[in-house]
C-alpha cells in the first residue's frame, strides 16, 4: 500500500520541525516482542541514549519510556526549554496522564520492564517539566530522526 502524500499547501501549513530539539522512538519485533528505545539530537541524529532490548515489550511502552527518559535527561541538564518530538500520540497521552496504560501481561520474563514503567510513572508524579512535547509529523517530514530504520 502506498502512503498518502501531502500537497505542498498541506506541508506548508504544518511547517518545519524545530531542529533544536531531541527526538525519541521505539522499535519492537513482535507484539509483544523484543523492544528497545532511544533518543537523538534532531538536527544530526547523534544518539543521546539507547535502552534495551527488553523481552516481551510493546512499541507503545517503548515510546512512553523513551519520552520520559528524554524529559528526565533534559531536566537533569537544565535544558527545560528544548522540545521533544515523538511520533506516538499514545505515548504523548500516557505522559500527560502520568500513566502507562498498557494491557500487557507481565511475568518473570519481563519484570524488569514493569519496574522501569513504575519508575517512569513515579518520576512523572514527583517531577514537573516545561519541555514542549511535540508530535513529529511523519507525513510531512519523513521518519522521525530517532527511527530505527527497520520497517
Language-model features and meaning:
Residues 29-31, 72-150:
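RNase H catalytic domain
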Residues 8-61, 72-73, 148:
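RNase H-like nuclease fold core
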Residues 48-49, 66-68, 110-111:
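Short, charged/polar low-complexity linear motifs in solvent-exposed/disordered segments
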Residues 61-68, 72, 118:
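A broad detector of short, well-ordered amphipathic alpha-helices
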Residues 56-60, 64, 106, 110-113:
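Flexible, glycine- and charge-enriched loops at secondary-structure boundaries
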Residues 1-3:
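N-terminal accessory interaction module
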Amino acid at each position: 500500500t502506498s502512503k498518502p502524500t501531502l500537497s505542498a499547501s498541506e506541508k506548508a501549513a504544518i511547517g518545519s520541525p524545530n531542529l533544536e530539539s531531541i527526538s525519541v522512538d521505539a522499535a519492537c519485533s513482535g507484539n509483544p516482542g523484543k523492544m528497545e528505545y532511544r533518543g537523538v539530537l534532531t538536527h544530526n541524529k547523534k544518539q543521546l541514549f539507547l535502552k534495551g532490548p527488553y523481552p516481551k515489550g510493546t512499541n507503545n511502552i517503548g515510546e512512553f519510556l523513551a519520552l520520559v527518559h528524554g524529559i528526565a535527561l533534559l531536566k537533569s541538564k537544565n535544558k527545560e526549554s528544548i522540545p521533544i518530538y515523538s511520533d506516538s500520540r499514545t505515548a504523548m497521552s500516557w505522559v500527560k496522564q502520568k500513566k502507562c496504560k498498557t494491557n500487557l501481561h507481565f511475568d518473570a520474563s519481563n519484570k524488569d520492564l514493569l519496574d522501569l514503567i513504575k519508575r517512569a510513572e513515579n518520576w512523572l508524579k514527583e517531577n514537573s517539566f516545561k519541555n514542549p512535547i511535540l508530535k513529529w509529523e511523519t507525513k510531512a517530514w519523513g521518519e522521525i530522526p530517532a527511527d530505527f530504520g527497520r520497517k
